[in-house]
């Protein structure tokens, strides 16, 4: 993706910083919510992590549960890597509360942890990712600027057990309400395309005058678009997604999805490995590292395809 910004140090520093600071090659675990295969967002996170591992000479272990709801699988994977002597963990927690005890165990045993994409509850752990409240507010502003005041609108929520889902729901609700729009439905579709379509179908049945839908990720947004196509309503309703995955950017360029919010998933993976490695080498890092957001419309969609 053309728009992504990589954060690289000088090559002469990387060798000593990245690999052999205490005489052995570091192993960093990247623990994501789902496999990159079939999911452009996680594929981009993995690509960033792999590039960082190659740049810094790190042994990278990428693991994820088979489904995003399979919290215990993620916990078991972390337990296994701690037992194998992993040097650091960069994790996107499936459920921050459920994974907190095993992460506390990791930290207590000397294994540093950083969060990527989704913040957690463990004290003193750095978060690397998007300010999701601000990103959702940016999506809400686009909707406010493009539909009449007082219009009916809906929000497709992600998993509300995750801070990402909570913050996108919060930012979108606040933004849409403050500009005078009428939120007729706020329903979870759990980041899933098929659920996005079925939930949108239900919303359309009860709210035929709806003018806009904010989908908390692109998968749900693409599902909403399919539901609108099936109902012959796509020309009457704007859909704004979140992630700017290549398929969503293509939809924006084609005039189907109206807009999406880009978050820099590649950098989450890259900086997750980079900063877990810094901690493993005894360095300090900031408490929060914001990877940024930008509005993607037809004017700049090609940059994300």
Predicted feature residues:
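Sec-dependent signal peptide recognition
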Residues: 2-10
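A residue-level marker of the well-folded mature domains of exported/periplasmic proteins
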Residues: 3-4, 17, 21-305
């Amino acid at each position: 993706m053309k728009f992504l910004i990589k954060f690289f140090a000088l090559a002469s520093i990387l060798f000593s910083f990245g690999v052999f600071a205490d005489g052995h090659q570091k192993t960093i675990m990247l623990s994501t919510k789902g496999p990159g295969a079939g999911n452009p967002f996680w594929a981009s996170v993995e690509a960033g992590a792999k590039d960082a591992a190659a740049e810094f000479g790190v042994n990278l272990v990428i693991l994820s549960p088979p489904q995003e709801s399979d919290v215990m699988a993620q916990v078991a994977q972390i337990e296994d890597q701690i037992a194998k002597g992993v040097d650091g963990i960069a994790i996107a927690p499936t459920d921050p509360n459920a994974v907190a005890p095993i992460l506390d165990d990791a930290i207590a045993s000397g294994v540093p942890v950083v969060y990527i994409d989704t913040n957690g509850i463990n004290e003193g752990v750095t978060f690397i990712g998007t300010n999701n409240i601000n990103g959702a507010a940016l999506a809400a502003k686009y909707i406010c600027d493009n539909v009449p005041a007082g219009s009916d609108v809906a929000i497709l929520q992600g998993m509300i057990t995750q801070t990402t889902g909570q913050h996108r729901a919060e930012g979108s609700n606040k933004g849409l309400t403050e500009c005078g729009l009428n939120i007729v439905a706020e329903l979870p579709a759990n980041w899933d395309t098929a659920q996005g379509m079925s939930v949108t179908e239900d919303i359309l049945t009860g709210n035929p005058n709806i003018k806009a839908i904010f989908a908390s990720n692109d998968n749900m947004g693409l599902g909403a678009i399919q539901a609108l196509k099936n109902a012959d309503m796509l020309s009457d309703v704007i859909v704004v997604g979140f992630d700017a995955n290549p398929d969503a950017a293509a939809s924006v360029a084609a005039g189907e999805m109206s807009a999406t919010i880009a978050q820099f998933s590649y950098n989450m993976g890259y900086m997750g490995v980079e900063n877990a490695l810094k901690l493993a080498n005894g360095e300090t890092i900031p408490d929060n590292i914001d990877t940024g957001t930008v509005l993607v419309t037809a004017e700049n969609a090609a940059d994300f395809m």
